[in-house]
Curated annotation (Swiss-Prot):
Coiled coil: none annotated. This is Transcriptional regulatory protein HptR. The modification 4-aspartylphosphate is found at residue 55. It holds the Pfam family Response_reg. It comes from Staphylococcus aureus (strain N315). GO terms for molecular function: DNA-binding transcription factor activity; sequence-specific DNA binding. Member of the two-component regulatory system HptS/HptR that regulates genes involved in hexose phosphate transport system in response to changes in extracellular phosphate sources. Activates uhpT expression to facilitate glucose-6-phosphate/G6P utilization by directly binding to its promoter. Antagonizes CcpA-dependent transcription of a subset of CcpA-regulated genes involved in antibiotic susceptibility. Residues 170-191, 217-240 bind DNA. One of its GO terms (biological process) is phosphorelay signal transduction system. Residues 153-250 form the HTH araC/xylS-type domain. The gene is hptR. Gene3D superfamilies: 3.40.50.2300, Homeodomain-like (1.10.10.60). It is found in: Cytoplasm. GO terms for cellular component: cytoplasm. Keywords: Cytoplasm, DNA-binding, Phosphoprotein, Transcription, Transcription regulation, Two-component regulatory system.
Amino acid sequence: MFKVVICDDERIIREGLKQIIPWGDYHFNTIYTAKDGVEALSLIQQHQPELVITDIRMPRKNGVDLLNDIALLDCNVIILSSYDDFEYMKAGIQHHVLDYLLKPVDHAQLEVILGRLVRTLLEQQSQNGRSLASCHDAFQPLLKVEYDDYYVNQIVDQIKQSYQTKVTVSDLIQHIDVSESYAMRTFKDHVGITIVDYLNRYRILQSLQLLDRHYKHYEIADKVGFSEYKMFSYHFKKYLQMSPSDYCKQAK
């Protein structure tokens, strides 16, 4: 769901953070690494990560220069520093970085920071989704936060966690102790649409948040769980009565 760029000129540090931290537990499924600020800036501009973890002292472009370059971008920054980097750290304060970590990095402390960050990111995503949903009739069934049926709530939660994958109804209900026919009937009774319909509407809703982030449309299709672009385009037109390209033109 989220992306992170890890920048440090010491390979053992950047690869250690990539391998040791259970990123998936914090909804980060794409991890990029860079050995200096120049590489990091290129990755950040190309992939627009939600989080950047960067060392301060690096060759070619140091961490403070990198912060200056990405000051206007919507990403969170964690600075890695040594005890003698205080002057560099002060320079970073003006950029409102998320946090500072001393080397060697305390992985438990980093995970605490990630936990706080992901709660904020998920809440922002939820608010953005509700705002978009309220503007389109097709997404009205997605606005309800909770249903009065345990199994329905479990399925909705599973959809929100799994929509980016090629998930099936069987996959969505495998963790609840009911038959597929019962789950499908109960879901339709409470929500008013089928499980598959809800899943596809949710995927299209999430795609709207990606359309203004410079992704190619086939990339968006893949990111929200459609196996091929033509299926994404079909469902987009089905729910919004226009193509993704027309939607982008209208939004400008």
